[in-house]
């Protein structure tokens, strides 16, 4: 790996809610390990990345701003190796991800995709939704208010209207599923796959894990979980 020059792009703090320290530590540790292997890692903030010409042949990115993602895609189209792909990051925005997963038969909560200026009460009642989650659909969540738990259609309508007033035009509504909440990290085509109960570990972005509460230890078929995650990554 010697003589490889890498542009390392950090994540703006606005996209690391309650995890700025964690995300910075991950980035720094990865850069440190690459340097130990002989790579030169040039570090850019998102602002620097968007303003400067990137000459490095490899880009290691944790960025999330719209302009950053567009630039990652441009660099990838020009032939640079970009990790993670700007196209993959864009596919993880809520509405796009929901359409991709449902369209490919990946297990996913029943969902509605709506404009935030719609009257949704009748849609929710027809779909049988009571408790559900409203999430901004246009981009990555930046604030606690970008993800909302509601207990009935009337409350959902009020929250959706608040999204509209904040300039968010699209939202995804997921039915609430009762059960253990699991978080996982994995790398496709590798042995790395790690899962845990975020509420039990005190790992949280917005505190919404408390809705499901402490885990009950429901049996998990880890092979099936990993297989589902692999299919989703594809």
Model-derived features: positions:
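Conserved N-proximal alpha/beta basic substrate-recognition cap immediately N-terminal to
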Residues: 10-115, 119
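Active-site nucleotide/adenylate-binding loops and adjacent lid/helix of ATP-dependent enzymes
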Residues: 2, 7-12, 77-79, 87-174, ...
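Short polybasic/polar patches that bind polyanions
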Residues: 35, 102, 125, 230, ...
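Short N-terminal or domain-adjacent regulatory/targeting segments
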Residues: 1-2, 43
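Short catalytic/ligand-binding loop motif for oxyanion handling, primarily in non-cytosolic enzymes
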Residues: 68-69, 141-143, 181-183, 194
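Phosphate-binding site of ATP-dependent enzymes
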Residues: 149-232
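C-terminal active-site "lid" helix and adjoining low-complexity regulatory extension at the edge
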Residues: 30-33, 219, 234
């Amino acid at each position: 790996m010697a003589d490889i020059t890498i542009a390392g792009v950090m994540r703006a703090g606005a996209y690391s809610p309650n995890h700025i320290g964690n995300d910075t530590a991950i980035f720094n540790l990865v850069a440190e390990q690459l340097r130990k292997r002989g790579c030169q890692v040039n570090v850019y903030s998102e602002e620097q990345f968007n303003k400067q010409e990137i000459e490095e042949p490899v880009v290691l990115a944790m960025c999330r701003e719209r302009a950053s993602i567009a630039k990652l895609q441009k660099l990838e189209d020009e032939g640079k190796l970009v990790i993670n792909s700007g196209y993959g990051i864009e596919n993880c925005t809520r509405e796009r991800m929901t359409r991709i997963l449902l369209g490919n038969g990946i297990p996913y909560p029943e969902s509605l995709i709506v404009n935030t200026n719609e009257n949704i009460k009748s849609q929710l009642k027809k779909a049988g939704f009571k408790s559900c989650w409203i999430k901004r659909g246009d981009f990555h969540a930046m604030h606690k208010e970008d993800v909302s738990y509601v207990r009935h259609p009337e409350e959902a309508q009020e929250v959706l209207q608040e999204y509209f007033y904040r300039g968010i035009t699209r939202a995804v509504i997921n039915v609430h599923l009762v059960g253990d909440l699991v978080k996982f990290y994995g790398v496709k085509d590798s042995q790395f796959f790690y899962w845990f109960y975020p509420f039990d570990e005190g790992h949280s972005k917005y505190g919404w894990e408390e809705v499901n509460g402490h885990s009950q230890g429901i049996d998990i078929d880890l092979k099936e979980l990993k297989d589902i995650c692999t299919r989703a990554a594809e």
